[in-house]
């Protein structure tokens, strides 16, 4: 890729992985595949329902790709929660990815949002109608404080996606805008709060740790994502409203300076994450560490981020950063490179077609009279 700062990216990635002491040992291969298939299967059946198919209006290939990406993220990162919780979170976060990739103007469907919310009516916006229907399945896993974070952060995410519809990177001199938008659409509080299901953590007992984790995760999670996404977004016309690009516009700096700004903030956040929780409740630290390592594995292994292209490009180079990056990449691939054919079946489109055929058969069944039923 022309002009992509490969050497800088390698150095940054290596420092990040060293800071978090990357060593993903969350699962055996069998456990990983089992959890992937369980979460995928439940989520696929959810999105194959006629109501979801009709209201989402998403290209089947895009929906399939989105679901596989999100199931991977949840299973790899939320390694401590139950399989049922993984499945319900996979559905919720797939909805968010579908919205993130949407180009529909939300304004008309949001005119009566609060009135409908207050009156308990179904939302006019189809995304909100479906997300609200599924929310009880998600919230049943969490206490009230964590649940509030999930609800509020999801609302922020919707607003962030609304802003992004305008492809507005901020005005020059508006230094607060890039981080404002990234926090809005980053789902950091939703992610940070969903690590603590009530079957594993009493949120009253661990309230201080959970609150601190939500605060720290807000930046760490989105900054790592921005860093690991930088390659795939570098020349993608659809991804020009990124944090790095918005730094360039608002801070009036070069792309290299913007990338360095993101790098320093990500590395500082990584140091903080480890330092703050290293002497806290071991179960809390273990949960955070498993999330960080799994989250990195997911980025390195998921085809969406195309980091295998970087690996192929530099695997024969003799620089220290290239060798370290390749070692980390191979380490991630050894545990996380699982072909979708091993777990992502059946396809959502296949399930939807089966449901549609069943509905047609049901509609053509003869209607029995009351006399025939008695006989």
Curated annotation (Swiss-Prot):
SUPFAM superfamilies: Terpenoid synthases
Keyword list, A-Z: Lyase
Pathway recorded for this protein: Sesquiterpene biosynthesis; trichothecene biosynthesis
MF term (GO), any: trichodiene synthase activity
Residue stretches spanning the membrane: none
Statement: the UniProt record of this protein carries the keyword Nucleotidyltransferase: no
KW Lyase (keyword) present: yes
InterPro entries (alphabetical): Isoprenoid_synthase_dom_sf, TRI5_ascomyc, Trichodiene_synth
Top-level taxonomic group: Eukaryota
Catalytic activity of the protein: (2E,6E)-farnesyl diphosphate = trichodiene + diphosphate
EC number(s) given by UniProt: 4.2.3.6
Signal peptide feature range: none
GO biological process: sesquiterpenoid biosynthetic process
One Pfam family per UniProt: TRI5
Record's miscellaneous remark: Trichothecenes are sesquiterpenoid toxins that act by inhibiting protein biosynthesis.
Family (UniProt): Belongs to the trichodiene synthase family.
Function: TS is a member of the terpene cyclase group of enzymes. It catalyzes the isomerization and cyclization of farnesyl pyro-phosphate to form trichodiene, the first cyclic intermediate in the biosynthetic pathway for trichothecenes. It serves to branch trichothecene biosynthesis from the isoprenoid pathway.
Protein name: Trichodiene synthase
Lineage, broadest ranks: Eukaryota, Fungi, Dikarya, Ascomycota, Pezizomycotina
Gene name in the database record: TRI5
């Amino acid at each position: 890729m022309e002009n992509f700062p490969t050497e800088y990216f390698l150095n940054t990635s290596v420092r990040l992985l060293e800071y978090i002491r990357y060593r993903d040992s969350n699962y055996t291969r069998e456990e990983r595949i089992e959890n992937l298939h369980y979460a995928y299967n439940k989520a696929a059946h959810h999105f194959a329902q006629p109501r979801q198919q009709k209201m989402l209006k998403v290209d089947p290939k895009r929906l399939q790709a989105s679901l596989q990406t999100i199931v991977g993220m949840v299973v790899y990162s939320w390694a401590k929660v139950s399989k049922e919780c993984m499945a319900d979170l996979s559905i919720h976060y797939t909805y968010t990815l579908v919205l993130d990739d949407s180009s529909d103007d939300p304004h008309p469907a949001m005119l009566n949002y609060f009135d409908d919310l207050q009156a308990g009516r179904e939302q006019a916006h189809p995304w909100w109608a479906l997300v609200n229907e599924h929310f009880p399945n998600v919230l049943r896993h969490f206490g009230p404080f964590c649940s509030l974070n999930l609800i509020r952060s999801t609302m922020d995410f919707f607003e962030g996606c609304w802003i992004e519809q305008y492809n507005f990177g901020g005005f020059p001199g508006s230094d607060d805008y890039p981080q404002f938008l990234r926090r809005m659409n980053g789902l950091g509080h939703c992610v940070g709060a969903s690590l603590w299901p009530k079957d594993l953590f009493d949120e009253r007992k661990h309230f201080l740790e959970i609150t601190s984790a939500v605060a720290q995760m807000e930046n760490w999670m989105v900054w790592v994502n921005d860093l690991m996404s930088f390659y795939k977004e570098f020349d993608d016309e659809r991804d020009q409203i990124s944090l790095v690009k918005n730094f360039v516009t608002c801070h009036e700096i070069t792309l290299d300076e913007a990338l360095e700004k993101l790098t320093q903030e990500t590395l500082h956040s990584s140091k903080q994450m480890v330092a703050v929780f290293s002497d806290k409740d071991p179960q809390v630290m273990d949960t955070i560490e498993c999330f960080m390592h799994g989250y990195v594995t997911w980025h390195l292994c998921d085809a969406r981020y195309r980091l295998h292209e970087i690996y192929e490009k530099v695997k024969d180079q003799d620089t220290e950063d290239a060798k370290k990056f390749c070692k980390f990449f191979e380490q991630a691939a050894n545990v996380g490179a699982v072909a979708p054919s091993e777990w992502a079946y059946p396809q959502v489109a296949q399930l939807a077609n089966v449901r549609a055929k069943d509905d047609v058969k049901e509609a053509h069944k003869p209607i029995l009279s009351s006399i025939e039923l008695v006989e």
